């Protein structure tokens, strides 16, 4: 009911994802302004990250996420374990929660490593840039910052198949709905042959739609329309 109250009692609505905009229109018959979250193409990498975390460039799979059920961590972990992948799977996110501890315990004797929360952007960008694959399991919540930040770092992203993610990545981006879907993708012998092409396409999307200067300009124009009492 909070959603309904907020939508129906707001003078102006901003949707950060096309799928959210469509949802509001279909369910409430109300128009909203689409303005997404922003990101910048990565240019600075942390020289010490590789040594600090003992990672090897291009020799790991990565996820950065809140450890919550809707982010499909178990699905991705189970898919990884059922695949033939031998490189480690690193998960960055706070595991000092009930669900985080459950995951850490469940996968403690595997090649899945929970690194905890990392807040240094250069370190996070270094992980994203050097990851072999980046698995994005978020299934709710519009445009997720972790996804566009991974795209901005030229990570080879594989996304959960839902309207929120699919409206952000390039049209032929790889996606999964089930454990078996993802396991099959991980086992494709030629999967890395698509890395440069798809990563570059997603980076072009960032630079054409999600750069912060573009986002800020959209907000400025929207606020000026509001101040000018123009119909929106």
Describe the role of every protein-language-model region.
Residues 1-12:
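Membrane-proximal helix-turn-helix segments that form the acceptor-binding/catalytic region
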Residues 9, 20-40:
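Helix-loop-beta element that forms the nucleotide-linked donor phosphate-binding surface
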Residues 14, 54-71, 77-84, 90:
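Conserved donor-binding/catalytic core segment of Leloir-type glycosyltransferases
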Residues 101-121:
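Nucleotide-activated donor-binding/catalytic signature segment of Leloir-type glycosyltransferases, i.e.
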Residues 125-131:
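Short alpha-helical donor nucleotide-sugar binding micro-motif in glycosyltransferases
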Residues 138-139:
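Aromatic "clamp/platform" in nucleotide-sugar-dependent glycosyltransferases that forms part
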Residues 147, 156-159:
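Short hydrophobic beta-strand element within catalytic cores of glycosyltransferases
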């Amino acid at each position: 009911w909070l959603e309904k109250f907020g939508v129906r009692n707001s003078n102006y609505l901003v949707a950060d994802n096309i799928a959210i905009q469509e949802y509001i229109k279909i369910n409430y018959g109300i128009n909203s302004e689409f303005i997404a979250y922003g990101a910048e193409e990565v240019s600075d990498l942390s020289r010490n990250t590789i040594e600090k975390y003992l990672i090897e460039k291009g020799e790991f799979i990565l996820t950065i996420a809140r450890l919550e059920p809707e982010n499909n961590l178990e699905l991705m972990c189970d898919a990884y374990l059922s695949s033939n992948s031998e490189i480690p799977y690193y998960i960055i996110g706070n595991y000092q929660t009930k669900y985080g501890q459950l995951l850490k315990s469940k996968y403690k004797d595997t090649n899945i490593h929970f690194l905890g929360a990392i807040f240094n952007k250069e370190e996070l960008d270094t992980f994203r840039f050097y990851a072999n694959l980046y698995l994005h399991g978020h299934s709710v919540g519009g445009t997720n910052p972790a996804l566009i930040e991974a795209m901005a770092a030229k990570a080879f992203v594989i996304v959960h198949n839902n309207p929120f993610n699919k409206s952000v990545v390039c049209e032929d981006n790889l996606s999964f709905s089930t454990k078996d879907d993802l396991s099959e993708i991980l086992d494709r012998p030629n999967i890395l042959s698509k890395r440069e092409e798809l990563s570059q396409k997603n980076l072009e999307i960032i630079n054409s739609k999600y750069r912060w200067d573009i986002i800020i300009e959209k907000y400025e124009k929207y606020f000026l329309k509001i101040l000018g009492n123009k119909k929106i």
